[in-house]
Design a protein with these regions (language model features):
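Catalytic domains of carbohydrate-active enzymes, especially glycoside hydrolases
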Residues: 61-87, 191-195
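Solvent-exposed loop/turn segments flanking beta-strands in beta-repeat/beta-sandwich domains
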Residues: 426-454, 479
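Active-site neighborhood of glycoside hydrolase catalytic domains
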Residues: 176-323
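Active-site-adjacent "subsite" loops/lids of carbohydrate-active enzymes
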Residues: 41-61, 132, 137-191
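Pro/Thr/Ser/Gly-rich low-complexity, intrinsically disordered linker/stalk tracts
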Residues: 377-432, 491-504
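Beta-strand-rich modules
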Residues: 470-494
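Aromatic- and acidic-residue-enriched segments that line the glycan-binding/catalytic groove
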Residues: 88-103, 138-165, 201-222, 268-274
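Substrate-binding cleft of secreted/luminal carbohydrate-active enzymes
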Residues: 283-284, 288-306, 322-399
Length: 504
């Protein structure tokens, strides 16, 4: 095979990423519980589908390939974009099918299938969470880029729309707009077995609002005299009402938001864009009022950046997370890209820093393609170093603290392929829940049984399976004591477990 100078440079960069991960491995904490998320962005076909005109079968094949590669890299949660521009990548009676799915807004996939239902099923097969990602306000990303369907909200309710150049958004100050968004969330939570609802950073637009909503303010200002405070209140009301709505329908469904990483510069000594003053979002209010389950700030800058230093923002966010989960957003598609001009070790350095900050509960990578396409060896580094062992998602005891019962009748036997484990499903726990997953550990005979040690976890499987075959062939690596525990939907682990010993 012929290698150019560029080929060698790319290979060498990947090699450096591997070596750096190896060196740092001894310095990192192996955690039994952490959120390892990846965004699957559908707008502009960033991650999926690769083209707007694919057949349904090709779309499914691509999605399965993405999930398989994310799973192999150790990812345990997927943030799947289902609403990009007041459209739907699911079967909605409220909004039109997405242009990014079929090449024509309002046209369903042919042959028909429901992408959200499909990705939920496939994610759960792999013991991965599936969070439905919605852009709450964005209606048109780029005006006139494609024809809008007749039932698009801009055609149905033109009075709800604010325009900023080529961008159109739903007006957050109009009460009917919030009702409309809540109805969409309600529809998704009621009809789909999702694990979470996720909002990103798009509230009021990055193009600063001037007087576009001044008339709305006059009509709906209530007791507010300051339009900036009124705008923030509009966003806060939406976040609060979404949280209450989700809990009224299914309290096991999580709600998280990934805001822009800087609220105000005064907090972490930064000199960047302030989302509190432009996007009018107030994450500290959401955390204080406990109207979200997790916060995932987009810390898309480098450690040591002169104006927006990751190294300053991370500890600040960890200090304000309170009792909610903190998952750090990484721009892996940029800083792991082979053409990235910064340090090749940047992403590894960020992960190491996260492990050193105890209040960080996990990470979310934007976007999936950086892992699927193994940018700079990222997927390999995850698989063999950072995420070498499966991880459970962090518990949310404010939502559910009742553990499931342990599996029963665990038996083991040697077969040609390895060691076969078989067990039975337990009764329901006192909250009525059955196991959603099973966790399998393996210990050597001379080892202490420590279920807090994630290096002893060999697999995490969906509860539809009650048979598992350990196919690891190297007897020196494989122990002979197997333990199986149960996990419920919110990752509470059974207090008891089943144990079996196989003769060497």
């Amino acid at each position: 095979m012929y290698y150019t100078k560029l080929n060698y440079l790319v290979i060498f960069s990947c090699f450096l990423f591997f070596i750096q991960s190896l060196v740092l491995k001894s310095q990192t904490f192996k955690l039994k519980r952490e959120f390892r998320g990846a965004y699957i962005a559908t707008v502009s076909n960033i991650d999926w589908p690769s083209d707007k005109n694919l057949s349904s079968e090709k779309q499914k094949t691509e999605l399965i390939d993405i999930l398989d590669k994310l799973k192999a890299a150790g990812i345990n949660a997927v943030i799947f974009q289902i609403r990009t521009e007041c459209d739907a990548l699911y079967n909605s009676s409220i909004e039109p099918w997405s242009y990014w799915l079929t090449g024509k807004q309002g046209r369903a996939p042919e042959p028909f299938y429901d992408p959200l239902e499909f990705v939920i099923t496939e994610a759960h097969k792999r013991a991965m969470e599936l969070h439905a990602w919605l852009n709450p306000y964005r209606a048109v990303k780029n005006n006139n880029s494609y024809p809008l369907a007749g039932n698009h909200v801009t055609n149905q309710h033109p009075g709800w729309i604010l325009k900023f150049g080529e961008l159109k958004i739903l007006n957050p100050g109009v009460p009917e707009v919030e009702k409309y968004i809540l109805n969409i969330v309600k529809d998704v939570v009621e009809r789909y077995d999702i694990d979470g609802i996720h909002f990103d950073d798009y509230f009021y637009p990055y193009t600063p609002v001037k007087n576009e909503d001044s008339l709305t303010f006059k009509i709906y200002q209530s007791n507010f005299t300051n339009i900036q405070d009124w705008r923030r209140n509009n966003i806060n009301n939406l976040i609060s009402d979404v949280y209450q709505l989700i809990n009224s329908i299914n309290p096991k469904v999580k709600f998280g938001v990934s805001p822009f990483g800087i609220i105000e510069n005064k907090y972490a000594g930064t000199k960047g864009f302030e989302s509190y003053k432009v996007l009018y979002c107030d994450p500290l209010y959401w955390i204080d009022k406990k109207i979200i389950d997790y916060i995932s700030p987009q810390l898309y800058w480098e450690i040591g950046h002169k104006s927006t230093d990751y190294g300053k923002l991370l500890p600040w966010w960890s200090s304000v997370k309170d009792s909610r989960h903190l998952y750090i957003g990484h721009f892996s598609s940029r800083i792991a890209d082979e053409n990235y001009s910064g340090k090749k070790s940047e992403l590894g350095d960020q992960l190491r820093m996260n492990y050193q900050i105890q209040n960080v509960n996990g990470d979310i990578f934007f976007s999936a393609k950086s892992i699927v396409n193994n940018y700079s060896g990222l997927a390999d580094s995850m698989k063999f170093f950072w995420y070498e062992f499966p991880a459970l998602l962090p518990e949310m005891n404010w939502k559910d603290s009742i553990p499931p019962l342990a599996p029963v009748n665990l038996k083991s036997e040697k077969i040609i392929d390895g060691i076969k484990l078989k067990w039975s499903e337990p009764d329901s726990a006192r909250d009525g829940e059955y196991p959603r997953y099973y966790l399998i550990y393996c210990f050597k005979e001379d080892e202490d049984i420590n279920l807090g040690d994630p290096t002893k976890i060999i697999n995490l499987i969906p509860a539809v399976q009650t048979i598992y075959i350990d196919k690891r062939l190297y007897s020196g690596k494989r122990g002979n004591i197997y333990i199986v525990s149960s996990l419920d939907r919110l990752w509470n682990e059974s207090r008891q477990f089943s144990i079996t010993k196989i003769d060497k």
